Amino acid sequence: KRDKKESIIFKGDDNSYYEKVGSTIKNIDDSIPFEIPRNWCFIRLKELWELISGRDLSPSEYNDNQDGIPYITGASNFRNGKIELVRWTPSPQVITQKGDLLLTCKGTIGEMAFNSFGEAHIARQIMAIRNIYGLNSEYLSLCISFYIGEIKASAKGLIPGISREDILSLILPIPPENYQSLVVSQIKKSNHALYLIENSLS
């Protein structure tokens, strides 16, 4: 049974982009970041990925002597795209799994890293984006990186934070599955070339 709130984005005969949610159709040209090839499509993140919001533990529920599974508390755990494990908990409640893309959403926002170690509890400063359809996770991280500036600009409150809806509503350009890895590979090559150029100039 199809979700009545399912979002379907399509290009009309007038070359404008529209989104259909239930029986409502509206023009979303202002939300479309760029044109895409004919065999690509735009889709909201919530249609293909699961978003898991973390929950804080009390001091009595975690430790630093590796008792239990890792406890990821926030941006302090993120180092150059990797996760440092410094706390553990024997009573996890909200669990990230290996392969999830982890994103900081409170305080220092927009830090990202893949879960490469397995089950861990995440605090409320962290969201886990879970790939439920076997798409290319690295491609997803590149898409979110494209929006990082916009995501940070949307952060609200005395302690900056982004909401679930900020992430779930992101409009992503999705190429055919076999093309996603090619896009990732080409961007990696371009980034490496830029790195070499910057190093040669410094």
Segments predicted by a language model, with ranges:
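Short coil/turn segments at secondary-structure boundaries
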Residues: K1-R2, S58-D67, S154-G157
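Short amphipathic alpha-helical signal-transduction/dimerization elements
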Residues: S145-I148, K152, N191
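A short glycine-rich beta-alpha junction/loop motif
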Residues: A120-M127, K156-N178
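Extended, domain-scale alpha-helical bundle/helix-rich regions
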Residues: K1-T24
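Non-catalytic DNA-recognition/assembly elements of restriction-modification systems
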Residues: E19-K20, T24-D56, S169, P173-S185, ...
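Sequence-specific dsDNA recognition surfaces
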Residues: V21-S31, K46-E61, G68-K98, A123
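Short helix/loop capping segments that flank catalytic or ligand/cofactor-binding pockets
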Residues: N80-K82, M112-A113, S137-E138, S181-L182
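A short beta-sheet element
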Residues: T73-A75, R87-Y147, S163
